[in-house]
Regions:
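Terminal connector regions
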Residues: 467-542
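Glycoside hydrolase catalytic-domain context in secreted enzymes
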Residues: 1-474, 482-492, 496, 545-988
Length: 988
């Protein structure tokens, strides 16, 4: 009996010790995570010195930060969310002027999950909703005075839950919910059938090209088709209006089939923007938004679709490199989005390059046909009035290399409106270009503006354009930018397609009469009054005009990314030919399914290559931890220019440990007591900040209408205002730095993070990101533009090799960032997870050269959140210009050990340089505003850290005690059993 009792105690202690160890591990893990997110935890708890107490009130609209001023601000913020939708919603289709609705058309029925459960934003890092204030389409309709069919709403509420909405499932309700009793209600609410169509994807997950039903995710799914068929068959609705709640350009070739009357693209409206879109429906607001992407009849018709997603390396007998399994190759070159559709259209009209062949067709019935391939062009949008455009004058200032187009817009309708002036250009496509693989888009955006034009009135506006935008990058011949000889055409129009038709009419005259068509296939004549011509002064190709950087004349612009081209690495039998308009049929991309990892490629994929330079300085060559006669604090550096020698004295006060504090991001940067620098919080994201306000009701920060909407406003003022409102949000949340905006190019309509980027066009993103960043700086917020660059898909994003040619890199993908980083006010840039070619972006010396040398960029550089992933190398990243490690406090420790163990002065110099950038940037934010001199940094750890450490000790001690008790009882059991056996043996 005693033995059984003892064994029972042992088993109990075994269970208790196991539970205690598990709990201790959970507590330790929680502590680790909390410390990694220190900035966010401090921010949430309002810890003094963690970004919650420094001033910056001079940046606020009211000149103060208080509960009272917050109440005024938050009202203005939500009003601006609605304004984003008012100016960014795009009227794509309006048969027989179905919109705006009359005041008598107020009895309506809503259809589609998106009407009651829309996609407000992606689920990437960013703002959370404030449920009491968010607005669905139904909410916005009811607020606007519409009588919404309650029977249908009740049917949705009681219906079986639909399939989860995901990147591979639309998640629409089963149309079986429309029973006879439900459809009987249609007659009383038959003024309008509103159908909301939604698509969802997010960080880490691209939209599936083929969904769970085996269909393209951007075509109508069966349940959606059933909804439209139900509406059509009922015969009860006077109008059918579609609200397109998708940032992904959906296939829209079915409108006639279902008798749709109007389509309003509302994108992802954020949590509070939908009322603005409904004001467009009612006519309270005249629509003025224009598309930022091409809406194709078949969403896989772009040449990029042939090489999107994951393609596997073939390592053969070699051991695969860490995070080196996959690649993607941009074989389409510069022909992204409208550059493909419009260029192929011109060549089809002019009979060039076999453009009318069937190769690459997805929707055409007999050879490539623009009207069958495209539903709505890039830059297109309708209004409730009509505008006529004339390009009155084109001036060129050679001193500033700037073109100025003077454009008159006449409102010939009976409604006041906002007219978007889109200026496009066409460069000559020459024999030199063909011989040197220089590609030319038939039309490219150059600039834009937006103006109010009263009914019956005319307004004149000027649009300035850098002459540099007309240059083309020649990676083969000149190895730099070139300006071809010949005529350059400038044109305005309602989108790229209309502008191109205007150019063709001016350039070709009678030769194209009867051949030009709009997206519906209607013959058009083109407007030659909307075109101006400039003849380049050079009689042969000019390879010198843009030889040196326009931002830093001491730096020559030449090939930097030869090794980003797949042909640099591929075996001869796997080399590719980039798409060329000289031969559409033979160069149209095919899928590069695999790539053999030869020795050259295998060595290139190895990221762990850092070796201390033979001539590296010694750590002893540097003065660290110097005690100056008069201490220089953080606040003493306010207003000190970046190149002022005072920075040397300031930085010399810091020890190596002090220097490394700034370089480890824990959703913020810790305080540095040595110079009395406070800690700060850093937050995501492009759709709104994942933080809470520190004033008023302490609600979540604002979830704005997302960046495709901001782009679709085509309004510099609204885009700047977006940055300012975002920055004001940050002031009331005590946040000086944010990871926003996003500026990657929408190479494919299936890109998972479309909601965080502006456009398929690098020039539109150039201007929009520049304006947003400027607005943020106006409010003391450092925007961190991301993800630099070639980060156009989520599949395999950590470690994927992204291959592209240098012309596409410079004219498309880097240009989207150039406005904010080289021209604008951004002092932050985040590199991408992917490799540029085979080199991880944050360790790519070419990126540092572009940013620091060519663009003369003076801000900080941060990697994306790798957290010690194997394919990255901390010293390689540091030497390539990375200044701070995102969500990673381990890397600075690694750097410290490497510097001290190897006496590596080169690494130390990079650490000092990084701190120079980081301190300078922080001082340009609200951290360097009023009240900075009053901050006192304490050695004391925040109370929550002390508490967690105490809990760690307690639970670890309990776990150890439980294990000890288990061991003791187990030993006692064994000892007792031995004694029992000995007694039994003696009896025998």
């Amino acid at each position: 009996m005693a033995q059984k009792e003892t064994s029972s105690k042992s088993r109990r202690w075994l269970g208790l010790s196991g539970a205690a160890v598990l709990v201790a591990n959970l507590v330790l893990t929680g502590t680790t995570i909390a410390f990694q997110q220190e900035g966010e935890v401090n921010h949430a708890l309002g810890i003094e010195g963690a970004g919650a107490s420094y001033g910056g009130t001079e940046f606020s609209a009211d000149g103060t930060l208080s509960d009272a001023s917050y109440e005024k601000y938050i009202e203005a913020a939500y009003q601006f969310c609605e304004q984003e939708e008012e100016e960014g919603s795009v009227l794509l289709y309006n048969r027989n002027n179905a919109l705006p609705l009359s005041e008598s058309e107020r009895n309506v029925t809503v259809f589609g999950r998106g009407s009651i459960d829309p996609v407000f934003r992606s689920t990437a890092g960013g703002s959370s909703t404030n449920p009491d204030y968010q607005k669905t389409p139904v909410d916005a309709l009811q607020d606007a005075g519409f009588n919404v069919n309650q029977t249908v709403l009740d049917a949705y509420a009681s219906a079986e839950a639909p399939k989860e909405r995901s990147v591979s499932s639309v998640g629409e309700y089963d149309p079986a919910l429309f029973t006879d009793s439900v459809t009987d209600s249609f007659a009383s609410y038959g003024d309008v059938a509103f159908v909301t169509l939604s698509r969802f994807a997010t960080e880490g997950n691209d939209l599936a090209m083929v969904n769970d039903e085996g269909k393209r995710m951007l075509e109508l799914d069966d349940n959606e088709k059933a909804i439209f068929q139900k509406i059509k068959d009922s015969g009860k609705f006077k109008k059918t209006v579609v609200l397109l709640n998708s940032v992904f350009a959906m296939e829209m070739d079915w409108l006639d089939e279902y008798n749709v009357d109007a389509v309003l693209w509302v994108g992802n409206p954020g949590f509070y923007g939908m009322p603005g879109a409904i004001r467009v429906v009612t006519g309270e607001v005249n629509p003025s938004g224009h598309t930022t992407a091409t809406f194709a009849a078949n969403s896989l018709s772009a040449p990029s679709a042939e090489n999107f997603g994951l393609h596997a390396y073939n390592y053969g007998s070699k051991t695969p490199r860490a995070a080196g399994d996959s690649f993607v190759s941009y074989n389409e070159g510069i022909y992204v989005g409208y550059r493909y559709y419009e260029t192929r259209y011109e060549d089809t009209i002019l009979g060039q390059g076999n453009a009318d062949s069937a190769v690459g067709t997805k929707a055409s019935t007999d050879g490539w046909n623009y009207a069958e391939e495209v539903c709505f062009p890039f830059g297109y949008g309708l209004s409730y009035t009509n505008y006529e455009y004339s390009l009155d004058k084109l001036d060129y200032n050679s001193d500033t290399d700037t073109f100025t187009a003077t454009v008159t817009v006449s409102n010939t309708g009976d409604r006041d409106g906002k007219a978007t002036v889109e200026l496009y250009g066409q460069s000559p496509y020459t024999d030199y270009d063909k011989q040197n693989n220089v590609e030319k888009s038939s039309i490219q955006l150059l600039g834009y503006d937006k103006i109010d034009v009263a009914a019956g009135a005319s307004e004149t506006v000027t649009v300035d354009v850098p002459g540099y935008f007309l240059a083309s990058y020649d990676a083969k011949g000149a190895k730099g930018y070139i300006l071809d000889a010949g005529d350059y055409y400038f044109a305005v129009g309602n989108g790229a397609h209309e502008a191109l038709n205007n150019v063709l009419a001016a350039k070709c005259g009678d030769a194209v009469a009867g051949k030009l068509i709009d997206q519906d296939g209607n013959v058009v004549t083109g407007n030659t009054a909307a075109v101006a011509t400039w003849t380049a002064p050079n009689t042969e190709v000019d390879t010198q005009k843009y030889r040196n950087s326009r931002y830093n004349s001491d730096v020559e612009v030449t090939n930097t990314f030869d090794d980003a081209d797949v042909n640099y690495w591929a075996n001869d039998d796997e080399k590719i030919t980039y798409l060329s308009r000289s031969a559409w049929d033979t160069t149209y991309p095919t899928t590069l399914e695999t790539l053999t990892v030869n020795d050259k490629l295998y060595n290139g994929l190895n990221m762990q290559t850092y070796v201390k330079a033979a001539d590296a300085k010694s750590v002893s060559d540097f003065n660290l931890g110097v005690e100056l006669d008069e201490k220089i604090n953080f606040s003493d550096m306010i207003g000190v220019a970046f190149d002022d020698p005072k920075w040397n004295d300031f930085l010399s006060q810091l020890t190596l440990s002090d220097l490394l504090i700034n370089m480890g991001d824990s959703k913020g940067i810790k305080a540095v007591k040595a110079v009395n620098k406070p800690g700060c919080t850093i937050v995501d994201g492009p759709e709104g900040m994942n933080g809470q306000f520190k004033y008023g009701d302490r609600r979540n920060c604002t979830g704005w209408a997302t960046l495709p909407i901001v782009g679709a406003t085509w309004n510099h003022d609204v885009q700047t205002r977006f940055g300012e409102m975002y920055g004001e949000d940050a002031l009331y949340a005590s946040i000086p730095i944010a990871y926003a905006p996003g500026a990657d190019t929408l190479r494919s309509p299936y890109s998972g993070r479309t909601s965080e980027y502006f456009s398929e066009d690098g020039v539109l993103s150039y201007y929009a990101a520049k304006a947003v960043s400027h607005g943020m700086r106006n409010k003391g917020l450092i925007g961190t533009v991301k993800h630099f660059f070639l980060n156009e898909q989520e599949a395999g994003r950590q470690g994927i090799s992204t291959f592209a040619n240098e012309q596409a890199i410079r004219e498309i993908y880097m240009r989207a960032f150039e406005g904010s980083l080289a021209e604008g006010d951004s002092l932050g840039v985040m590199t991408a997870y992917n490799r540029i070619g085979v080199m991880y972006a944050a360790a790519n010396q070419g990126i540092q050269h572009i940013l620091r040398d060519e663009w003369n960029y003076g801000g900080y550089i941060i990697d994306d959140a790798l957290t010690a992933s194997e394919y990255s190398s901390a010293p390689e990243m540091l030497m390539a210009g990375n200044n701070i490690f995102c969500l990673d406090t381990a890397r600075p420790n690694e750097i410290e050990k490497l510097i001290t163990s190897t006496d590596d002065g080169d690494l130390l110099q990079k650490v000092i340089d990084s701190n120079h950038y980081l301190y300078y940037v922080m001082l340009q934010s609200s951290m360097g505003g009023s009240g900075a001199e009053d901050v006192v940094v304490s050695d004391a750890a925040p109370w929550w850290q002390t508490t967690l450490r105490a809990l760690d000790v307690v639970f670890c001690a309990l776990a150890v005690a439980a294990v000890v008790m288990y061991v003791l009882h187990t030993y006692t059991d064994v000892f007792s059993e031995e004694k029992r056996k000995n007694r039994a043996a003696k009896k025998n």
